[in-house]
Amino acid sequence: MSYCKQEGKDCIIFVTKEDHEAPSNAELVEDDPNDPYEDHGLILPNGDINWNCPCLGGMASGPCGQQFKDAFSCFHYSKEEIKGSDCVENFRGMQECMQKYPELYPQEDDNDSAPSGGANTAPTDSLPASSTDSTAAAATENPATS
């Protein structure tokens, strides 16, 4: 016969060998596809946006969370030929909000994406010759005999 013993906040359950030999009568509950706490991707099975998805990186919360939700929802549900083209104002509102909080939403700096020294600083001797230049050079080195 099994029994429980309470020790502080813990409940220790003691079971007998006979308890373990009997088949389990536990009923498994089928997963609820609309359970907001269940792990889902960005889009829930019913087509709604999962605002709890870690893939959003917390953008749905915070001072610009509502603007993000408005813009993202508009894009997700957009029926325009160019998806999201009807959402420009929503994204503009989100961008304006984010610019008010640069410590939370840092702007990408154009200088960070360019290689050091600028784009046009490669020495010319390291540039590959074009195929026509190499063909012309080969023709002058090995003139055809007639």
Swiss-Prot record:
Residues 123-140 have a biased composition (Low complexity). PROSITE patterns: CHCH. Keywords: Disulfide bond, Mitochondrion, Oxidoreductase, Protein transport, Redox-active center, Translocation, Transport. Residues 101-146 are annotated as: Disordered. GO terms for molecular function: protein-disulfide reductase activity. InterPro entries: CHCHD4 (IPR039289). Its main location: mitochondrion. The keyword Mitochondrion applies. Residues 61-105 form the CHCH domain. It is found in: Mitochondrion intermembrane space. One of its GO terms (biological process) is protein import into mitochondrial intermembrane space. A motif (Cx9C motif 2) lies at residues 87-97. It comes from the Eukaryota. A motif (Cx9C motif 1) lies at residues 64-74. GO terms for cellular component: mitochondrial intermembrane space. Disulfide bonds join C53-C55, C64-C97, C74-C87. The keyword Oxidoreductase applies. The CHCH domain contains a conserved twin Cys-X(9)-Cys motif which is required for import and stability of chchd4/mia40 in mitochondria. Monomer. Can form homooligomers. Central component of a redox-sensitive mitochondrial intermembrane space import machinery which is required for the biogenesis of respiratory chain complexes. Functions as chaperone and catalyzes the formation of disulfide bonds in substrate proteins, such as COX17 or MICU1. Required for the import and folding of small cysteine-containing proteins (small Tim) in the mitochondrial intermembrane space (IMS). Precursor proteins to be imported into the IMS are translocated in their reduced form into the mitochondria. This is Mitochondrial intermembrane space import and assembly protein 40.
